[in-house]
A protein has these predicted regions:
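FAD-binding core/adjacent interface of flavoenzyme oxidoreductases
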Residues: 1-7, 61-148, 221-226, 233-238, ...
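Mid-to-C-terminal Rossmann-like scaffold of FAD/NAD(P)H-dependent oxidoreductases
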Residues: 2-5, 11, 24, 277-371
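Beta1-alpha1 glycine-rich phosphate/pyrophosphate-binding loop at the start
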Residues: 2-74, 160-183
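Glycine-rich Rossmann-fold phosphate-binding loop(s) that bind the pyrophosphate
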Residues: 10-13, 129, 150-153
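A Rossmann-like FAD-binding core segment of flavoenzymes
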Residues: 28, 75-93, 99, 166-262
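FAD-site-proximal beta/loop scaffold in flavoenzymes
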Residues: 121-142, 213-222, 227-300
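Rossmann-like NAD(P)H-binding beta-loop-alpha module
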Residues: 136-184, 218
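C-terminal catalytic lobe of FAD-dependent flavoproteins
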Residues: 221, 227-253, 324-394
Length: 394
């Protein structure tokens, strides 16, 4: 049986960040990463962008193959970990191979959530989560003219824009009463909707896909209210669910995700978890930046450190052609809103305050002050102090 000091299951950004941090703190300890995918860690957050671009797989890699060799990190690809033997500190792969470990990191990531829609298994309905998905979707789209997007969140809109760049007719179906409900208030979301409509997008709000139409192959969608949309391709962007199959029937505690403490430790002494698979403080974030930071903390702690992970404030940037958006912090629990508007230039900025401190912001158009405002949200700057430097806000 092969043995290693550090075993990482998964090679997403959390797994890679952990491996980097382990090697920074332990130059000699053996590190093995195992992944069911056929590619080294890549920029998953760029997949939607590359729907409308020609590229090589290597362009998407976070670190090239030579980096792993230089750092003496062994990566096992195209293998699935089928079982964790917590008592004997070993895992079993789908080919029967066993690997023993001293410290284990679970970084198995997440999978797309496909809502329970009648006919959802028809050819032509897909979700974009992996590089393999991207290659399949790009090929399938070559024969599509009308494509529908189920989900009007951030990733959904980015995908919709990529589809428009491929000269597709694009419909966006959103269950909520307005787009980006987590990042925007209704007033600014309405402005975004207007802009998207001007670019030719068809938008269906407060809408739910009830049935995928077609005889084995997608031809359309039936919405609530008996409305129908013709579609020869459907991309679902309805969120994620942690990959818990490996740990579900072990002693590792899990709920919506693998439950960890502020050190990214599970309830089992030598087992850690990080990334999309993790639940911390009752939350599953599913964010690239969070996965990166969690991986760093977990990796360092696997070498004996006692670092703490702090939940980040959420920042969102969306740039699609002439459309520019930035959202930061808390926008749904505040005392007052301070605004700056320039209708001629189509700019609308809002600062949300609580107890006279800036707790959140939304910028629509002109993002030059984005970093300044981001820092003000992070530090909860006094609105009075901020206005002294930026008198646009009232």
């Amino acid at each position: 049986m092969e043995k290693t000091k550090y075993l990482i299951i998964g090679n997403g950004i959390a797994g890679l960040a952990a491996a980097r941090e382990i090697r920074a703190n332990d130059e000699k300890g053996i590190i093995i990463m195992i992944s069911s995918e056929s590619t080294l860690t890549y920029y998953r957050v760029k997949l939607t962008e590359y729907m409308s671009k020609e590229f090589t797989d290597e362009e998407l890699l976070v670190s090239k193959e030579n980096w792993y060799k230089d750092k003496n990190i062994k990566v096992i690809l195209r293998k699935v970990v089928e079982d964790i033997d917590i008592t004997n500190n070993k895992v079993r792969l789908d080919d029967g191979q066993e690997i023993g470990y001293e410290k284990l990191l679970i970084a198995t990531g997440s999978r797309p959530f496909i809502p329970p829609i009648n006919g959802k298994y028809k050819e032509g309905l897909f979700a974009l989560r992996t590089l393999k998905d991207l290659h399949y979707i790009k090929e399938y789209l070559k024969s599509c003219n009308d494509v529908s997007l189920i989900g009007g969140g951030l990733l959904g809109l980015e995908a919709a824009w990529a589809l428009k760049e491929l000269d597709k007719e694009v419909s966006i179906i959103e269950f909520a009463p307005y787009l980006l409900p987590r990042q925007l208030d209704k007033e600014i979301s309405d402005k975004l909707e207007k802009k998207l409509s001007e670019h030719g997008f068809k938008i269906y709000l407060s809408s739910q896909a009830e049935e995928i139409l077609g005889d084995g192959v997608v031809t359309g969608i039936k919405l609530n209210g008996e409305r129908k949309i013709e579609s020869d391709g459907i991309l679902v962007s309805s969120g994620i669910r942690p990959n818990l199959d490996l740990v579900r029937y072990t002693e590792i505690e899990c709920n919506r995700g693998v439950i960890v403490d502020k050190h990214l430790k599970t309830n089992i002494a030598n087992i850690y978890a990080a990334g999309d698979v993790v639940e911390i403080d009752g939350m599953v974030l599913g964010l690239w930046t969070a996965g990166n930071e969690q991986g760093k903390v977990a990796g360092a702690n696997m070498t004996g450190k006692e670092l703490e992970y702090n939940q980040p404030k959420i920042f969102t940037t969306l740039k699609m052609g002439s459309i520019e958006l930035f959202s930061a912090g808390i926008i749904d629990d505040f005392d007052r809103v301070h605004e700056y508007k320039d209708d001629e230039r189509d700019i609308h900025h809002k600062l949300f305050t609580r107890d006279n401190k800036i707790v959140g912001a939304i910028l629509f158009g002109d993002l030059k002050e984005m970093n300044t405002i981001r820092n003000a949200v992070i530090s909860n700057t006094s609105i009075d102090e901020y206005i002294k430097k930026d008198s646009r806000f009232k």
